[in-house]
Amino acid sequence: MKRLVLYLLTLASLTTAAQTITGGSLPPIRPIEKTVYDSALIRVYYEYRYRPDPNNTGKWRKAQTIMLIGDRYTGFADYAQIREDSLNDAYYREKRSPMELVSAVLTASGSGTYDSPLVVDIARNTATVQISGQINCQYTQNLKPAEWTLADGDTTICGIKCRKATCRMGGRDWTAWYSEDYAMPYGPYLFRGLPGLIFAISDTGCNHVFTLNGIVRLAVPQPIYLYKDNQQLVLSRENALKMKRNEAADPQSAMEMSGKSVTFIGEKRLKSLPYNPIELE
């Protein structure tokens, strides 16, 4: 939650300096800078569960994600972040105070943990992905058609009968459940190409699990967008994924490269972090 983190860091510094915080001490609300690609009239919700550490199979994290479907683009993002952006822009238009925004975001936000918003150009079959971290980056890739194998088996998800399919993508083997009753060849993240909407998909090791938990046809179009960030690195997909691997292996160097100061007593360094992305390669 980018803006929330900014406000909380500001609050922390103000508290340390003066022990008193007033709404006027906070930075003013500014609109979220974004690039809008399309407008969506369909929103599909997916619960996202994943294991941050592949060696700790008992520890899970959970987020609510959404897929937005437009005529020319689809988008996929963390729902808590989208709600925070909407609150920010609404409070900016209404000229409300920064303190009111902080309170509203703290009340409304969920556990936003999906950090790679993306858009897909349907006609060109290209995806632009943004990855947040110590250093934010963005890459654009041509999407190769997934080699789906339609398999025997069926199940019911949200009261809808679904069929089974399998594929290999990003160095993992995946099992998906899709419904031809919803004739949209889309799914969460970059999964697409089946003869119906994907209702659930997970890798065979159950490190990443997406399960549909809602579909809404919107009365008012919703923008499909990514963030404008002048400090964001534009990289190739290969270099972007390499950078995130290196950031997990040596988070202190990543912080120093981002311009953030790190001070430790003695010679201790930040420990490496577990790395278990959706795509391994």
Would you name each region that the model predicts?
Residues 20-281:
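Extended soluble regions of mature proteins
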Residues 1-30:
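Bacterial Sec-dependent N-terminal signal peptides
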